[in-house]
Amino acid sequence: MTDRPCTPTLDRVTLPVDIKGLTDRELRSLADELRAETISAVSVTGGHLGAGLGVVELTVALHAIFDAPRDKIIWDVGHQCYPHKILTGRRDRIRTLRQGGGLSGFTKRSESPYDCFGAGHSSTSISAAVGFAAAREMGGDTGDAVAVIGDGSMSAGMAFEALNHGGHLKNRVIVILNDNEMSIAPPVGALSSYLSRLYAGAPFQDFKAAAKGALGLLPEPFQEGARRAKEMLKSVTVGGTLFEELGFSYVGPIDGHDLDQLLPVLRTVKQRAHAPVLIHVITKKGRGYAPAEAARDRGHATNKFNVLTGAQVKPVSNAPSYTKVFAQSLIKEAEVDERICAVTAAMPDGTGLNLFGERFPKRTFDVGIAEQHAVTFSAALAAGGMRPFCAIYSTFLQRGYDQIVHDVAIQRLPVRFAIDRAGLVGADGATHAGSFDVAFLSNLPGIVVMAAADEAELVHMVATAAAHDEGPIAFRYPRGDGVGVEMPVKGVPLQIGRGRVVSEGTRIALLSFGTRLAEVQVAAEALAARGISPTVADARFAKPLDRDLILQLAAHHEALITIEEGAIGGFGSHVAQLLAEAGVFDRGFRYRSMVLPDTFIDHNSAEVMYATAGLNAADIERKALETLGVEVLARRA
């Protein structure tokens, strides 16, 4: 860690209005200081560093030219919003990023009027901008609508759906394509810079004419470069021709780190555009901080780190992460079954499929930010005789739900869904919480839904999924490390729809689904100290339920409590349905279901979030005492 940077220009800026009086030279100083402040802040909190560093100059230019919050600046995904937050009245809290009670790591409407539209998932910004522009034309909020979207987010179909609609409506809307992957060769780059300056100096309606006429004005060595640039833009998917066919005037590419290019182009668009415009800027993720630029993911997400060295502060763990256990287990299964393949939607590292891809590159598919396509692609792989594992975060699987129903479940195709980040995920907060998958999957006919209680169970569930060819099967597991149990040498397929009793007891049964089992066992020990010895069981399956186990627990106990890391409508609701149909409640049987509360829980550590949700050991103990009518002890618990 180091002391905070010296930021004399940034110290003069509290809100975007303070930027308006700065000279272009001062804006360049502001950008340098903003980059240093962003690095310093994230070194304290951890977070998504690289994306923000890549848009520092763009952020300064946008707030210098546009009039937020009247003008709506919409940041796609939100990973890149830290510099924006510093310039919009939140610098004094920037070192609370992603901390409990602190700033969100994404844009959030309830946090600031400058966050006009919340984010967390990708590829939504253009739709929002088109919507804001339509509202303006119908008499709603005035001001421009500006979407800032990365080239990665452009791999999602939703972005092009929005471009198509925006071009059709023909309302003034500005899309800035933040391209941090392409590189333009020097001759072409020089040409692009020159043409961009010509564009900025001409009336907007004459942009195309200026571009055509510019060729003859260029120095002779540049003319061939100009022709090559024109052909290149026609041949690649991000070229201007595609966007113009969709109804957007195309400007660029320009250097997104050069304020001498950004400022005049944005000024011209602000002053003269009357219809949809797309500005293509080239940036570098992690710009200005060598450790981030050198990182494989260019500093996408980091823990706390030392500013001087870039060395991250990582907690020591005695157990492997669930993600790594999944990846290693899948590799073992694939070594003996050539039909096993893996599909991810732009998250190979996050899902562990980068490890699988290193071992089996021809059996690994990264489809981009396209969960809908990932699911249907996996369905066809299964129909074609393969055994696909579709590994997607719980929160992102929501984006492919229709395909799960229509293309997988109805056709009973054996797609294996590996659902990472199940339950509450900590610092990323509500947008990334895996709260709903059990509820929206378990109501589908013919699907198998499992949840691993620990890392050893996950190994067996990977083996179970690999061996299951009778229809779709899903297994969920959380973010973070396992609990440190002894690991099996090899996964053994579980009997479908069969749970297990962990420990025998009397009076009350605690039936866990997922990794709350560790907390359930702590609660059971506390209850035993009070003279109440509960039975503890691991359901393993939410669909199909272990009817025999559940009905036996009901028959031999006064009460049953289910515990899960999911929303209302999931495992506990299915257990209640079973008990009701079996007439168990007719004899006065006591049943309680502990689930995530019916609210979106703000970011914090996962431990604090589960305490807020009422799903830690003390809460389980208290619920057991209340259910048994031990009110005095329950109040003390």
Curated annotation (Swiss-Prot):
It catalyses: D-glyceraldehyde 3-phosphate + pyruvate + H(+) = 1-deoxy-D-xylulose 5-phosphate + CO2. Keywords: Isoprene biosynthesis, Magnesium, Metal-binding, Thiamine biosynthesis, Thiamine pyrophosphate, Transferase. Its EC number is 2.2.1.7. InterPro entries: Dxylulose-5-P_synthase (IPR005477), THDP-binding (IPR029061), Transketo_C/PFOR_II (IPR009014), Transketolase-like_Pyr-bd (IPR005475), Transketolase_BS (IPR020826), Transketolase_C (IPR033248), Transketolase_CS (IPR049557). The keyword Translocase does not apply. Binds 1 Mg(2+) ion per subunit. Binds 1 thiamine pyrophosphate per subunit. Pathway: Metabolic intermediate biosynthesis; 1-deoxy-D-xylulose 5-phosphate biosynthesis; 1-deoxy-D-xylulose 5-phosphate from D-glyceraldehyde 3-phosphate and pyruvate: step 1/1. Its cofactor is Mg(2+); thiamine diphosphate. PROSITE patterns: TRANSKETOLASE_1, TRANSKETOLASE_2. The keyword Repressor does not apply. Thiamine diphosphate binds at residues 79, 120-122, 152-153, 180, 289, 371. It is an enzyme of class 2 (transferase). SMART domains: Transket_pyr. GO terms for biological process: 1-deoxy-D-xylulose 5-phosphate biosynthetic process; glyceraldehyde-3-phosphate metabolic process; terpenoid biosynthetic process; thiamine biosynthetic process. Belongs to the transketolase family. DXPS subfamily. HAMAP family: DXP_synth (MF_00315). PANTHER family: 1-D-DEOXYXYLULOSE 5-PHOSPHATE SYNTHASE-RELATED (PTHR43322), 1-DEOXY-D-XYLULOSE-5-PHOSPHATE SYNTHASE, CHLOROPLASTIC (PTHR43322:SF5). This is 1-deoxy-D-xylulose-5-phosphate synthase 2. The gene is dxs2.
